């Protein structure tokens, strides 16, 4: 599906800190989800500002390991339902009216998952089941219950720059004629 719903928002103030569940959050270009330590990490631009996981994937992993662990223990920022997260970098997701995220890569399950339940790391490994990492393209406010949808494929930053330069050059040439 190309449209879903945001079921959960979580953040953690520092590495290994407990996840804090939120009803709504501000999302910024500089810091991802405000108050989340990972979103504020540097790296121009930081490609893991926000992490997302599908409810169906988390439920499938739980069934595989025979446990029922709350989704936020995955340490993802956003839980989505009814949307197949894109498994390719560069795809953009709109949440609510304003926020746009760009998928940067798969979220690789770490050893912490194995500490939660034996076999969980392996259960989260196939087909991006562990979720997706994203960077913020456009900030704003999100809330549980917001729609989340895949945007039409946008050109990359370099493609936009080339298009703009071509347009500007042709516009300038036309103006001189």
Name these PLM-found stretches.
Residues 1-177:
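Metal-cofactor-dependent catalytic cores
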